[in-house]
């Protein structure tokens, strides 16, 4: 059963308790430039041709580039971390106005991402950490972060949150979900639900929109649909194709 949902300017549908559809601003880095626009609606929608250029160059040099739940842009460049409101036009010098909130050591992380409540998660040296994000360049984040995973976390290809607070992950060829670990004694993978049987390691990008729609890039093509819920749910077979080719060429792609 589907119900129309209108919340904070988003319009979508509830299907089996999961919001699908809705308007979100897609951001991407392509050939060193930064773009934004509403996400493509079908395979003939040339997103790059209609997207707004919001950064002229240098964006491919970032190791991480992602948004907080509050809409601030975070970036790791040259081992340092910065934050600021996202750029809105191509003459907006984001690095010139962004606040440096970490002086060094940020290249050590394999994953860096937010949960829906604004906590920052990171994987370093096979371990998973969680803490509120740094506020200044003297804030030693890793020293105060809580270790919530004691090993095995470098083996994941994707780690990211659904807006409902569940952690989603790709390990090997398989896709999993569960509430995040709360301590380093919590064997997350052992208790997680398998929601994808194989082939998930072939995706280049895999991420949620703010309303819980799953987006993925595989084989240069861009897909969207509500996320799988059980191991034999063939997501790629039922997902909507919204990009015919070239999506593998993006350096970053996110909401």
Swiss-Prot record:
Q: Does the keyword Aminoacyl-tRNA synthetase apply?
A: no
Name it.
Tachylectin-2
Transmembrane feature ranges: none
What start and end residues bound the annotated signal peptide? 1-19
Q: Does the keyword Secreted apply?
A: yes
Localisation: Secreted; Cytoplasmic granule
Q: Which GO terms describe its biological process?
A: innate immune response
- Primary localization: secreted
Q: Name one GO molecular function term.
A: carbohydrate binding
Function, in words: Lectin that binds specifically to N-acetylglucosamine and N-acetylgalactosamine. Is part of the innate immunity host defense system of the horseshoe crab.
Subunit record text: Monomer.
Annotated Gene Ontology cellular components are: extracellular region
Q: Which UniProt keywords apply?
A: Immunity, Innate immunity, Lectin, Repeat, Secreted, Signal, WD repeat
Instruction: Please list the residue ranges covered by the WD repeats.
Output: 20-67, 68-114, 115-161, 162-208, 209-255
